[in-house]
């Protein structure tokens, strides 16, 4: 009888030895819900790459919500990233190469190796074995929901993790494989919906984090979702989804409002796009899904990229399940998730797209050369009219005046304000009314340049500062100084402080004013690299769009 306590104690010790994180002979080992994995060490960080969070969406699982991953018995190697999701072979490099060239730097495009088997994520822990319960930051990469990967080397999370957080980066289905709508898909779905598969992947990854991140030393109740461009849009969209409740506590949105100028496409429009693509791919088949699921994924993506000329097929839609209503209405009605929010933009978001478009499309139209500034700005005004009403033309007079003297800057400023600053300001105000803590920034540190190469703080330029990725091949061409190194450290501290406590401030840094306490206040990461508190984030006419949102009269009716 006396042996019973000993046996019980021994059993508990053996159980803990099998479940608790440990360091094996070749690297750190963690037991997850699907099985055990072995990662590697990167300086002080423990790194785990290529962790499956859902079953491969191949064969009959193409265009279905993500399914649970099959368990494995042996210790799985987690030292190499998983496949990128199928996309244009040039990937992110197609965006960076012409920008680098504009500054006189050579940049070689490296083709992306991708696969339909791509639902993997990566984890960086600041130390091993884990101690305590650390905040978690989950990264959603940008790329218009058509290109990119959470395993891009520019998103290496080790530098951010060193600030005392767990970093997770994920892949999610892209383009036609991630956002395809078709009436037959809706008919076979138990939720009577189609499309939004890439967003369902993101939700599945967040559920994986909820269930497993504790094994890495992370706190499943303190998760910050952060992303850039399309990743930021997706994060803002997920704030409106009932499927995201309790999956994250904070959001950092870099240059991506979840609503903007134009209406959200209807289900009928989205499904019509899908029917057109299906006809292009498999003809008038009586069972188009059977034949579409047999097509090689790369062939399908290539067909859409090269032959389809209709509306964007890589866009989300209000499907009645993931998104019950248009996001703008949910923000305006206060139906969003209760989260802390940080949002911001770069000083000249649109400047790089002129360079990228000209490089991508031979003899691409150059409206700044072929049209006068009046015509160009008027096109913005026509698009903006549903949002700003009769005040539109008066509101943009300053852009027209500026464009007369500096075409590029005038058009860039019009686009920055109308497409990003106004919606982000509305998002900040509506979130503050619902949840409280909101912080807003403007990143204006720019790459030095003259003439046409002076693109300013273009779209995506804050990324190497957030991840301290100046030595990564994507950004090695940047002329980095001690000022940039210091600014990167300050930005990382602000971002991780926010993830820890919902407040980016610390006693040793410039004070970042809270939008919820002083609407319109923000911090500027100024051209000289100094964080400076400011007032007046968006021009006054942006209040018109906010009024329309509140009155349910705006975009996304």
Show the residue positions of the predicted features.
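Bacterial N-terminal signal peptides
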Residues: 7-17
């Amino acid at each position: 009888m006396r042996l019973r306590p000993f046996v019980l104690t021994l059993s508990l010790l053996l159980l803990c030895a099998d479940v608790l994180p440990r360091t094996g002979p070749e690297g750190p080992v963690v037991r997850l819900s699907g099985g055990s994995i072995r990662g590697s060490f990167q300086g002080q960080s423990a790194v785990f790459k290529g962790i499956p969070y859902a079953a491969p969406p191949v064969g009959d699982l193409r265009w279905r919500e993500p399914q649970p991953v099959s368990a494995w018995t042996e210790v799985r190697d987690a030292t190499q990233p998983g496949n990128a999701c199928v996309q244009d072979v040039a990937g992110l490099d197609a965006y960076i190469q012409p920008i680098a060239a504009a500054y006189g730097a050579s940049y070689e495009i490296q083709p992306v190796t991708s696969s339909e088997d791509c639902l993997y994520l990566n984890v960086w822990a600041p130390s091993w074995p884990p101690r305590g319960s650390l905040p978690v930051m989950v990264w959603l990469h940008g790329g218009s929901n058509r290109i990119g990967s959470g395993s891009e080397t520019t998103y290496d999370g080790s530098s951010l993790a060193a600030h005392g957080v767990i970093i997770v980066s994920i892949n999610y289905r892209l383009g036609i494989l991630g956002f395809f709508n078709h009436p037959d898909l809706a008919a076979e779905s138990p939720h009577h919906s189609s499309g939004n598969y890439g967003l369902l992947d993101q939700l599945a990854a967040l559920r994986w984090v909820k269930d497993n991140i504790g094994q890495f030393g992370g706190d499943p109740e303190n998760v910050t979702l952060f992303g850039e461009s399309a990743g930021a849009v997706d994060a803002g969209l997920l704030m409106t989804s009932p499927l995201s409740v309790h999956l994250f506590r904070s959001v950092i949105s870099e240059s991506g409002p979840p609503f903007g100028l134009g209406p959200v496409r209807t289900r009928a429009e989205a499904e019509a796009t899908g029917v057109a693509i299906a006809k292009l791919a498999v003809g008038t088949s009586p069972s188009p899904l059977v034949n579409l699921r047999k097509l090689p994924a790369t062939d399908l993506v290539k067909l859409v990229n090269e032959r389809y000329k209709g509306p964007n097929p890589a866009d989300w839609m209000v499907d009645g399940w993931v998104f019950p209503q248009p996001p703008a209405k949910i923000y305006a009605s206060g139906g969003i998730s209760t989260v802390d929010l940080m949002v911001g933009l770069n000083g000249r978001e649109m400047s790089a797209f002129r360079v990228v478009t000209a490089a991508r499309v031979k003899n691409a139209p150059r409206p700044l050369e072929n049209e006068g500034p009046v015509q160009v700005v008027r096109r913005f005004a026509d698009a903006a009219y549903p949002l700003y009403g009769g005040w539109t033309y008066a509101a943009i007079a300053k852009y027209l005046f500026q464009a007369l003297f500096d075409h590029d800057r005038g058009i860039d400023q019009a686009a920055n304000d109308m497409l990003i600053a106004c919606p982000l300001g509305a998002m900040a105000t509506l979130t503050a009314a619902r949840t409280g803590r909101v912080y807003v920034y403007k990143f204006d540190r720019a790459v030095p340049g003259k003439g046409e190469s002076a693109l300013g703080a273009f779209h995506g330029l804050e990324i190497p500062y957030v991840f301290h990725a100046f030595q990564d091949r994507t950004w090695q061409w940047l002329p980095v100084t001690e000022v940039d190194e210091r600014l990167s450290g300050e930005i990382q501290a602000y971002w991780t402080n926010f993830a820890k406590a919902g407040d980016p401030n610390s006693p040793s840094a410039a004070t970042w004013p809270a939008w919820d306490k002083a609407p319109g206040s923000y911090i500027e990461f100024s051209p000289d690299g100094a964080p400076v508190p400011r007032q007046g984030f968006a021009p006054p006419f942006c209040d018109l769009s906010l009024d329309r949102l509140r009155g349910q009269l705006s975009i996304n009716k």
